[in-house]
């Protein structure tokens, strides 16, 4: 089980998220290479709303199937891992009087040299976190990767 150097899923999702200037070109290239891609934005004082926004966008864009449990479950774990980075391990937002404004990228595909390894999913989050007062936030980032 060897990672394919050009198919590192976490790296690709982070680069997609941070490269806003050439986003559409990058999405086309990723899709041409067999990746399923979803991009979006979410802002909330509730972590469950962040999770729901990412799941809804992923289903609408075809990154995961609407029916079934396994794909949603994998996305959930990748999203929670990314949120741990954003919130520095404390998954609370509104109850600690903080809010997030995030862009997200979800990428699905096989990052390994062997097709037998199957698909994985990566969620990258970038934006701001802080008190719900304009100007009192700071940058934050998180990434999560899970097998499907």
Swiss-Prot record:
- Functional summary from the UniProt entry: Antiterminator that binds to cis-acting regulatory sequences on the mRNA in the presence of histidine, thereby suppressing transcription termination and activating the hut operon for histidine utilization.
Outcome, altering residue 3 to A: Great decrease in binding affinity for mRNA
Looking up SUPFAM superfamilies in the UniProt record yields:
Hut operon positive regulatory protein HutP (SSF111064)
Q: Keyword set for this entry?
A: Activator, Histidine metabolism, RNA-binding, Transcription, Transcription regulation
Effect in UniProt of substituting residue 2 to A? Great decrease in binding affinity for mRNA
Name used for this protein in its record: Hut operon positive regulatory protein
Where does the UniProt annotation place the signal sequence? none
The record gives the effect of mutating residue 18 to A as: Great decrease in binding affinity for mRNA
What happens when you mutate residue 9 to A? Great decrease in binding affinity for mRNA
One GO biological-process annotation of the entry reads:
L-histidine metabolic process
So what family is this one in?
Answer: Belongs to the HutP family.
Outcome of mutating residue 7 to A: Decrease in binding affinity for mRNA
Keyword RNA-binding in annotation: yes
> How does the record describe its quaternary structure?
Homohexamer.
InterPro entries xrefs = Regulatory_HutP, Regulatory_HutP_bacillales, Regulatory_HutP_sf
**GO MF term (any one):** mRNA binding
Name the gene. Answer: hutP
């Amino acid at each position: 089980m060897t990672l394919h150097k050009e198919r590192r899923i976490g790296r690709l999702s982070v680069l997609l998220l941070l490269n806003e200037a050439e986003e559409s070109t990058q999405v086309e290239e990723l899709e041409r290479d067999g990746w399923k891609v979803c991009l979006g934005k979410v802002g909330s004082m509730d972590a469950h709303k962040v999770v729901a926004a990412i799941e809804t966008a992923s289903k609408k864009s075809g990154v995961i199937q609407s029916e079934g449990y396994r794909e949603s479950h994998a996305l959930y774990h990748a999203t929670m891992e990314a949120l741990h980075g954003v919130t520095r391990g404390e998954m609370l937002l509104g109850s600690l009087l903080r809010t997030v404004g995030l862009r997200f990228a979800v990428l699905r595909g096989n990052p390994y040299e062997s097709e037998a390894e199957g698909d994985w999913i990566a969620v990258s989050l970038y934006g701001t976190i802080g008190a719900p007062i304009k100007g009192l936030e700071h940058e934050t980032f998180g990434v999560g990767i899970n097998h499907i």
